[in-house]
Each structure stands twice: as C-alpha cells, then as structure tokens.
C-alpha cells in the first residue's frame, strides 16, 4: 500500500513539526528526513505534489483535499504510483487546532 501525505505547509517549520508529530520520523530528525529526499515525488513519502501553500495559491484547506482526491482517483498531474491511502492534515492558529482526513480508494 502506498501512503500519500498532504500536510498543511503554511511555514516550513510546520511541515517539520507535523512530520515528527505524525511519527514519520523521530523528534529532531525531520530536517534530515527531508534533506534525504524522502518527500520528493519518487521518495518514501511523496509530499504535497500540487505545490500547496508554499507554491500554489487559492483556498489552502480545499487544495489539500482536492489533490488528495486526485491522487486516489489516479488523475493527479504528479501521480504517485500505487497511491491507496492519503492523509490530509490541516491546522489553525499556532498549531493549537488540528484536523486530519483519511482518504482511500
């Protein structure tokens, strides 16, 4: 099963903190995890393939969901081969509210 990840990326540090909080890497290891290429399109955890907040404009919460749905349908521009499950994550304020949506096909 291929897991896709769609994390709210309002700031770079938010991505690093969320990767650690979700258990994709240990506390303090997110920067090395990213530098190792884990989040690239062909990496272990393809990440935010549509660009999201750091590269795309519009309604950020809906963009995360829309790209997750495209990945599950197999219609994404940067399709992750074998994508079967997608975690869509969003947060508000200074990381004090949080929501997670799991999508599957």
Regions found by a protein language model. Give the residues of each.
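Claisen-condensing/thiolase-fold acyl-transfer catalytic domains that form or cleave C-C bonds
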Residues: 4-105
């Amino acid at each position: 099963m291929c897991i896709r990840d769609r994390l709210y990326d309002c700031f770079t540090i938010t991505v690093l903190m969320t990767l650690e909080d979700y258990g994709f890497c240990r506390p303090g290891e997110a920067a090395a995890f990213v530098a190792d290429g884990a989040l690239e399109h062909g990496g272990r955890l393809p990440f935010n393939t549509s660009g999201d907040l750091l590269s795309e404009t519009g309604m950020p919460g809906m963009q995360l969901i829309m790209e997750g749905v495209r990945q599950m349908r197999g219609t994404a521009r940067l399709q992750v081969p074998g994508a079967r499950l997608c975690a869509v994550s969003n947060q508000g304020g200074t990381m004090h509210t949080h929501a997670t949506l799991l999508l599957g096909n």
